[in-house]
């Protein structure tokens, strides 16, 4: 065997060494590989295929990664054939790499990963989204921390129509934000570390994030979920934008755009106007109350028993707002669901109801009138039963009397004792799985001076707002006090006051 190949396969060491020694070995190995690449550049360019076939990316991930980095920077690998070979090797690497080794060389891993989704075009967008999604989940299987790669990837996936491959990543709940100064005294290769301890700007597994980038990520996630008709996930994503904590009680433009979409998606999801969470800042609530008023009126009209009110409000916002904000199709979908929710809500009054009576008691917001025939009602109800939005069955009496809809109990109401117990156990297991995350978060927050200062300021601001509210009960507010904040550096931590 070529002695140079021996250098590439000298790491990782045999099992049995502790994390500190493993990390030190990784740094020494990276230095030797760097020297090998520098002194044997021509050999690597000419023999890259043979070298990478010999170096298993799942076992010798660090060496494989550093060879990939060299080839990406090499002017000799610019032909179409070379690009295809390089893309093949990169795909193998991102699907197989050893996450423990990669933690020891975060900057190189990030640089190579960026090439997978860059405009350089080594991969078609569909392949790039699938590969980068797999790589990020391989680095952090919990998917609990957002990175700069998440932000770039969701934009690529949405803009190129490759949302499906992204879902395994964006469906993961984000718990952590990466920040400078989060590194631990423990070696990065310690597999017991929580994600923020090894994924942060210091380890270079992510770049620094701004508040604008995080808001954009959640907003695009919401759009991706809308595209897939995943209403609960879309609603949650937009709500994260709406309730985003900003410095000095500000509110960004993207938050107001998210608020409008949040209202529309909320109507589709629950059939009624959503209520702002308590965590929404007072400043944001004031801005939403004015800039989002047309959408709020549209949502209130959704509760009307006649479709005419909803149609009129739709015409108002369609002429002024919907086209400019990209909400035309979403609002039209709300119109289409108006009658569906009227039918669903009949279960609050009836156990069963004839299709003729459904025709009389419900209206289409698309036409502003009841459906023209009982057959049309029959088709609508059957489609709702088929897609799972309506728990019911159409009964057709043998004596020829009119067909009727029987409402069935929801799956939760019809659970047996055994099924209910299994559901409780599942919830308890989920809570138990969160315990180490909560413990790690509490430890970090308890020792974070900026967080403590921020908490004290929030309490002070809340008390001040309450006092001002008592003093000016019934009064208005000054629109000039609005602060539209476009960007805030999250890496600098929360402001000290």
UniProtKB/Swiss-Prot annotation:
Disulfide bonds: none annotated. Residues 233-408 form the PCI domain. GO terms for biological process: ubiquitin-dependent protein catabolic process. It is found in: Cytoplasm; Nucleus. GO terms for cellular component: COP9 signalosome; cytoplasm. Pfam families: COP9_hel_rpt. Keywords: Cytoplasm, Nucleus, Signalosome. Its main location: cytoplasm. Component of the COP9 signalosome (CSN) complex that acts as an regulator of the ubiquitin (Ubl) conjugation pathway by mediating the deneddylation of the cullin subunit of SCF-type E3 ubiquitin-protein ligase complexes. The CSN complex is involved in the regulation of the circadian clock through its control of the stability of the SCF(FWD1) complex. PANTHER family: 26S PROTEASOME NON-ATPASE REGULATORY SUBUNIT 3/COP9 SIGNALOSOME COMPLEX SUBUNIT 3 (PTHR10758), COP9 SIGNALOSOME COMPLEX SUBUNIT 3 (PTHR10758:SF1). Component of the COP9 signalosome (CSN) complex. Belongs to the CSN3 family. This is COP9 signalosome complex subunit 3. It comes from Neurospora crassa (strain ATCC 24698 / 74-OR23-1A / CBS 708.71 / DSM 1257 / FGSC 987). The gene is csn-3.
